[in-house]
Design a protein with these regions (language model features):
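Alpha-helical transmembrane segments
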Residues: 1-16, 178
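Alpha-helical transmembrane segments of polytopic membrane proteins
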Residues: 29-41, 103-114
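Canonical alpha-helical transmembrane segments
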Residues: 39-56, 121
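Hydrophobic, aromatic-rich membrane-embedded alpha-helical segments
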Residues: 41, 139-159
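Membrane-helix boundary/juxtamembrane motif in polytopic membrane proteins
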Residues: 63-67, 126-148, 167-170
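C-terminal halves and exits of single transmembrane alpha-helices
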Residues: 67-93, 110-119, 150-153
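Membrane-interface alpha-helices
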Residues: 133, 156-180
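Juxtamembrane boundary at the C-terminal end of a transmembrane helix
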Residues: 184-193
Length: 193
């Protein structure tokens, strides 16, 4: 049961790109569907502040990993789109400047989704510090990383390995991310060569 909200958050985060297109005629539904990930972020915060206080450190870590690992493809694809659109906006053609606005919108939505994922990680960090598992310096540094793209995932990977929890899964996810980045770079290089 504690994993239902994190799984739902990941699903909502992926569908927020798709849902506004389903409601072509009703603007209110488009707005609500675009804001759904932010509303789910508030739900995450409420769940962590109420029920989540009673959960174990492992449960909070698992909830964090569901969200962080589940959103890796979202941020890889979104990052590629953002970089492509930003580079396209640099070309001196009419209306290409408007592409810069797309970059700003993607960054705002991406950061909003990042913020919505943070409550579980912060709760885990606080609980692990209280139990003496991690030092205050590590907890503060990891807490700051929860608000920075990519660093949030890598800091949780390091802490997960340090906890000796889901080590094989974490290594497999890290290898998958490295392979995905390598394929993206090779694809970009093949375009220019």
């Amino acid at each position: 049961m504690p994993y239902l909200i994190p799984i739902l958050y990941v699903i909502v985060s992926y569908t927020f790109f798709l849902l506004p297109g389903l409601f072509d005629q009703v603007v209110e539904l488009q707005i609500i569907s675009a804001l759904l990930p932010f509303l789910m972020g508030v739900v995450n915060l409420i769940v962590v502040l109420t029920v989540g206080r009673k959960w174990s450190k492992k449960t909070l870590l698992n909830c964090t990993l569901i969200i962080k690992y589940g959103l890796i493809p979202f941020y890889l694809i979104g990052g590629c789109i953002t970089i492509s659109v930003t580079l396209a906006a640099l070309f001196p053609l009419p209306l290409m400047v408007l592409f810069g606005l797309v970059t700003v919108v993607f960054l705002i939505f991406g950061y909003g989704i990042l913020l919505g994922a943070a409550p579980y990680a912060i709760a885990y960090l606080i609980k692990s510090c209280k139990e003496g598992r991690h030092s205050k310096a590590v907890v503060i540094l990891s807490g700051i990383c929860q608000f920075l793209f990519s660093f949030d995932v890598f800091s949780m990977m390091i802490l997960t390995i340090k906890e000796k929890h889901l080590v094989k899964t974490t290594i497999a996810v890290f290898a998958g991310v490295c392979l995905a980045i390598l394929f993206i770079l090779l694809y970009v290089l093949s375009i220019f060569v």
